[in-house]
Each structure stands twice: as structure tokens, then as C-alpha cells.
Amino acid sequence: MGGCFSKKEYQADGNGYRSAPTAYHTVTDQSYEKSSQRSQPQAQPQPQVQQTGPSLKPRQVHRPESNTILGKPFEDIRGKYTLGKELGRGQFGCVYQCTENSSGQLYACKSILKRKLVSKNDKEDIKREIQILQHLSGQPNIVEFKGVFEDRQSVHLVMELCAGGELFDRIIAQGHYSERAAATICRQIVNVVHVCHFMGVMHRDLKPENFLLSSKDKDAMLKATDFGLSVFIEEGKVYRNIVGSAYYVAPEVLRRSYGKEIDIWSAGVILYILLSGVPPFWAENEKGIFDAILEGVIDFESEPWPSVSNSAKDLVRKMLTQDPRRRITSAQVLDHPWMREGGEASDKPIDSAVLSRMKQFRAMNKLKQLALKVIAESLSEEEIKGLKSMFANMDTDKSGTITYEELKSGLARLGSKLSEVEVQQLMDAADVDGNGTIDYLEFITATMHRHKLESYEHQAFQYFDKDNSGFITKDELESAMKEYGMGDEATIKDIISEVDSDNDGRINYDEFCAMMRRARNRRKLFSVSLTS
């Protein structure tokens, strides 16, 4: 969860590509977790045959290496591609720009370190994402998959380079916006859903960050780039694992009984944000967001909704219908009067306040997530030895994350008598990125003794404050965030404006601690419950 390019550590998107699929250390479908082990029959001794003719040279057989993930012989990516500048970095590896040697064409390469794929689930997840990328490649609005290579250290996924950046960045940079522009964007997003469902794939993690523009051209195509949580649809199967990102999760996911209709809900949330600048279900923490989603009350009264067309609001309502059986399908969305090309969507500019709110929403929590990563990486083995053991005991399937069920059973083994509601509150408190599981770094920062965490906050501040001036400047923040592939100049400005309460253009220590305190107050409950 929450990771740089994965659902682990922190959500650090490097040019929109992630250096490991989002599913690697998050809840995966049960059918991928365990397979029955069958005893193999003993090999019978072969009778010896006396050689009568000339000796034959044995035929060379290329067998896969013993530590292969893809089940085929290793191949050096450098034979076909030259790796160039780094686009992003995460716990699982890096994303590079690469050049095809034969054509000079630029691509993106996700290089995933195999030693980070510790469990059987991790390896199955990467194989499944590759299968889905190969299956969907060539379809409109989906990133083109070029190929995969494996060597002793890494798995390399080569795909189309989407140089146009993130969706929200483009909208904000343009500075003007209309319902017609929102309809054009949403049509491309729903087209991805339509193609996925038609080809038997459920995406399960639709959100703006998973879409990039193919180029910097004005009319660049929107491309879906991340299929780390996607699965092949099994007809008649009811899916029960909580996956996705908090703001975009459908109510039936929270009820642990869902199907492909969840993708329409997520697309509806994106459309609501495109029209208003904020998500439809909002709260200070994940539990509050989930409660709001389950309640299902959608605000069409606040600005700018009175000036949004009735046709647009009608489509949003139909996409955000609580009952998935009554929710509109992807084909019906594309045929809606507001959504159709040349349809009812107006070219009248939307209120500029929508763009301002969109900027704030995008910048939210990025600095906090990076600070927690810095803190967790600063801890010595001695300091976290007991916590590491506790995490391992709770992570019963060795997936690298703790699910709700694992947390509940782990607390019971510790003698806790917490109710299911209280366990969910603990889950929400520790789950910084809101993807429904607790990764190792989130667990460590949630369970550390409070005074120790506070002392490390000073160390984290010093990590950003390179010149020891007592302030984090724009340049210092930019340097730190780019080191982890986390943000462009616009994002950095937005973060400073959000945290900088005295408006002097810098972040002082008190402002930094105030930001961290908002996260720490939520996690205090988690720490007390585990260590008391």
C-alpha cells in the first residue's frame, strides 16, 4: 500500500508510471493466494542402454533459471534497449526512459527488483499484470505494452512513453475549463472501462493518477497506465477483497461483495471531481470517507453545482447509484446525451474555483507520506526488532501487508476483545494511503512510541532542511520530492501553500509538526491498542 509506484510506503508517482504494480503488496483475490500441493510420484530408475554406435553430441536445451519469475530463460534488455534518464523511483525499483536500439523510438521501462517480490502472491501478481497488459495492448486509451525482459536481478516492463504528464496537471495548467472538456476526458476514461469489461477485465483501481496524456500536444490522447490491481473477470464469482483508493471505492467493495460495476462508480467519482474540483465523499480520515460512501448522499447544492447542467448531474447520479444492479453500464454512459460527441455538454467555462480546489486536492498528503517514509527508513534494526516480529506474526499470508482479517485475528491472539467497528477504526488510523491494507512502513510509524516518533519528526524535518536554516524552502522541497519521483513544480507550490500557515513561502518546523500531528492523532489509537 501507499508505495512509490506500488501500494506500499507512499504514493510517489514518477511521471505516472509505477516501478511495481499496485497489487504486489495489497489484498489480492483469494484464488491467487494458495494452491494445493500434490505429492509427485517417485521417478522410476531408467534401464541402462549399451551404446553401440558413435557417441552423439547431446542436444542443448535452454531451461529457465531456477529463480525465474516468468518461467523462461533470462534475456538482457540491453540487447534491444538503452536505458536513459530516471523518471521515477520507488521501493520496488525504478522507471526509466529507454530507447529502442533498432528504431531510436522512446519508451518507458519499469524495472522491478526481484528480491523485493518476496511471496508467491507477489510473483503471481506481476505475472497477472503482464498478462492483462498484453491482453489489452493496442486498444484505445490504454498504454501500449511493448515487451517484458527478465534477468537475474530484475523484471523489466517496456511500454509506451506517455510524455504529456498527469490529467489534473494539464487541466490546471490550461487555466480554463468547460463541461465539454470534462465530457471529452470522461468519455476516454469510460472507454477504458468499456474495453476492459468487453475483454473480460475488471480494473478495480480507477483514479486520475492512473491516467497519463500520450504527449504534450493539445489534443493528446488519455491513456490508462496502471493495471496492478486488475483481474480477469470470472463469471458468477463474487469478489470480496477490499482494494482500490479511498475516495474512489464503490460501496459494494466496502460491503465485500462486488463485480465489474465498481469501475463505473470510480469513473463517476472522477467525473464529479472534474465538474466540481472535489470528491463527492469527503472526510478527515478514511473511516469518514467510507461512512460517507455507504451513506451515499451526493452534494449537488454547493458551488459550482447550481451552474452545472442538469444533464451532467443526471449522468453523475446514474454512475453513482448505490445499487450496482441499477447502476448505468459503460455502454449506457457512452450513449448518454451529455457524454456523446457533439452532445449536450456546454462549452461555457466552469467556475475557476473548481481548478483551485482541484489543485489543493491533488497536493494533499504528498509531503506527509514522504515524511513518514523518511522516518521509517531512519530507524535502526534494534529499535524496530519487536515491531518487525509483530508485523510478521500478523501478516499470516506473508504478502507484505496486513489486511482487516489479519489485523482482527492478530489482535485476538494478543488477547484483545475489540469489536469489529473498533478494529476497523484501528485499520483506518494506520492506513495512511487508504488502500485498505497496512504495509510495513505504515505499521512501524503507527506503532512506534509517540515520543520516539516525535523525535524522528525533527530528523525528518532536517532531511528536507538541507542548509539547516530552520525552514524548508521551495528548492529544498523540490530536491527531496524529485529524488523520489514525487512531484513537479506545480505540486510543490501547492504543498507549500497548504502547509505554510503564515504565508511566508517556506515551511517552518512548527508548520511541519502541525501537518504530521494531524496524521499522528489518527494513529495514536492504533499504537495504544497494540502495545497496551
Swiss-Prot record:
Residues bound to ATP: 87-95, 110
- Membrane topology of the entry: Lipid-anchor
Free-text activity regulation comment from the record = Activated by calcium. Autophosphorylation may play an important role in the regulation of the kinase activity.
Reactions performed catalytically:
L-seryl-[protein] + ATP = O-phospho-L-seryl-[protein] + ADP + H(+); L-threonyl-[protein] + ATP = O-phospho-L-threonyl-[protein] + ADP + H(+)
Which cellular compartments is it found in? Membrane
Which stretches of sequence are listed as region Autoinhibitory domain? 345-375
Gene3D superfamilies recorded = EF-hand, Phosphorylase Kinase, domain 1, Transferase(Phosphotransferase) domain 1
Question: Where is each EF-hand domain found?
Answer: 382-417, 418-453, 459-486, 487-522
Which Gene Ontology molecular function entries are recorded, alphabetically?
Answer: ATP binding; calcium ion binding; protein serine kinase activity; protein serine/threonine kinase activity
Binding positions for Ca(2+) 4? 500, 502, 504, 506, 511
Compositional bias segments (type: Basic and acidic residues): 1-11
Region annotated Disordered sits at: 1-71
Q: What class of enzyme is it?
A: transferase
> Do the record's keywords include Hydrolase?
no
Question: Which sites are catalytic?
Answer: 205 (proton acceptor)
Q: What EC designation does it have? A: 2.7.11.1
Q: What does this protein do?
A: May play a role in signal transduction pathways that involve calcium as a second messenger.
The entry's protein name is: Calcium-dependent protein kinase
